[in-house]
Curated annotation (Swiss-Prot):
Annotated source species: Bothrops neuwiedi (Neuwied's lancehead)
Superkingdom field: Eukaryota
Key words, A-Z: Hypotensive agent, Metalloenzyme inhibitor, Metalloprotease inhibitor, Protease inhibitor, Secreted
UniProt note on tissues of expression: Expressed by the venom gland.
Functional summary from the UniProt entry: This peptide both inhibits the activity of the angiotensin-converting enzyme (ACE) and enhances the action of bradykinin by inhibiting the peptidases that inactivate it. It acts as an indirect hypotensive agent.
Location, primary (coarse class): secreted
SS bond list: none
Gene Ontology MF annotations: peptidase inhibitor activity
Family per similarity comment: Belongs to the bradykinin-potentiating peptide family.
Name the UniProt record assigns to this protein: Bradykinin-potentiating peptide 2
GO cellular component, one term: extracellular region
GO biological process, one term: regulation of blood pressure
Amino acid sequence: EEGGRPPPPI
């Protein structure tokens, strides 16, 4: 489920 934490920086 998305919308919890933002994706990690790459």
